[in-house]
């Protein structure tokens, strides 16, 4: 990649100072060096690339991916990678790096079919205050929900696109990439069937979530999303919006408000307490932490299934 010389020079000096005597290995030269911007892309690359890729994830374990700011070391990692796989408008600092990376950057947005507006799944009249965390440090996802991986069928389409991109850069292993993507699609198809079956008959179809990350999940499995914080996890709903949502929860006899793992649960807990509901965890799987109900995407999705079955009173 060809990032600005000043940035790379700064990153090189910082990395040299921090790595003196560490014996850091930069790869064996026989694998495709792929940098991903957050966990679901890392997981897909690992599944599709297998032994032929070496993956570095820019969003570290336990970090909220929306908040990512690239360090000098990460800028250098991006500049040295064969590919940068990212989702445009999800992480502004990565967008900046991708612009400089040119042809080495691969945006999965088209393959993900980001065509559902999060607002269509928010509670009517649910506005949010500006201020600390209100605009989430200026992050702008546009009107579409970026969390495509919560619909396994869209995730499979992205995996296919990743396979084709890897095949283009590493034609010697093209057959392996395509075979791995086919296997991954089969796994995701099975997961989708589990979700369809498990969520086919639920008494409550209003899904009250921490932030509007579940538009694709809701659309795929027959729910209507009501978000506390909109698309940005740090946004603060106005008092009137909170009161409106509390009234809605009571009127519709909603029993569960879903919190997340990577952001504070205060708002969800307050909402649930004031509305007489319980709090459960519904993980948007933006990253895996010690608090995650599973060690990888598949396990956490199945934990989500169990949580929603209980919270939405599914039979």
Stretches with model-predicted labels:
Residues 2-11, 16-315:
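Extracytoplasmic metal-acquisition and chelation regions
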């Amino acid at each position: 990649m060809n990032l600005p010389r000043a940035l790379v020079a700064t990153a090189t000096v910082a990395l040299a100072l921090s790595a003196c005597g560490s014996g850091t290995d930069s790869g064996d030269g026989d694998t495709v060096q792929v940098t991903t911007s957050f966990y679901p892309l890392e997981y897909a690359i690992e599944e599709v690339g297998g032994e032929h890729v070496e993956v570095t994830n820019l969003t570290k374990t336990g970090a909220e991916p929306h908040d990512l700011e690239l360090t000098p070391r990460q800028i250098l990692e991006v500049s040295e990678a064969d590919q940068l796989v990212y989702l445009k408008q999800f992480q502004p600092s990565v967008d900046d790096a991708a612009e400089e990376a040119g042809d080495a950057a691969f945006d999965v947005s088209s393959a993900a079919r980001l065509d559902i507006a999060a607002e269509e799944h928010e509670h009517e009249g649910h506005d949010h205050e500006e201020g600390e965390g209100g605009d989430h440090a200026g992050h702008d996802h546009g009107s579409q929900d970026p969390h495509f991986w919560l619909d396994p069928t869209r995730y499979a389409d992205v995996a296919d696109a990743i396979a084709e991109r890897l095949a283009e850069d590493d034609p010697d292993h093209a057959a392996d990439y395509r075979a791995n993507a086919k296997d991954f699609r089969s796994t995701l198809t099975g997961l989708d069937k589990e979700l369809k079956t498990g969520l086919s008959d639920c008494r409550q179809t209003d899904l009250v979530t921490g932030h509007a990350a579940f538009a694709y999940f809701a659309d795929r499995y027959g729910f209507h999303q009501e978000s506390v914080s909109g698309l940005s996890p740090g946004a603060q709903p106005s008092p009137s919006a909170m009161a409106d949502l509390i009234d809605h929860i009571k009127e519709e006899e909603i029993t569960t408000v879903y919190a997340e793992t990577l952001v504070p649960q205060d708002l969800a807990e307050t909402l649930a307490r004031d509305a007489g509901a319980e709090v459960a965890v519904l993980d948007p799987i933006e990253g895996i932490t010690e608090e995650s109900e599973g060690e990888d995407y598949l396990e956490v999705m199945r934990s989500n299934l169990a949580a929603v079955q209980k919270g939405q009173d599914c039979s």
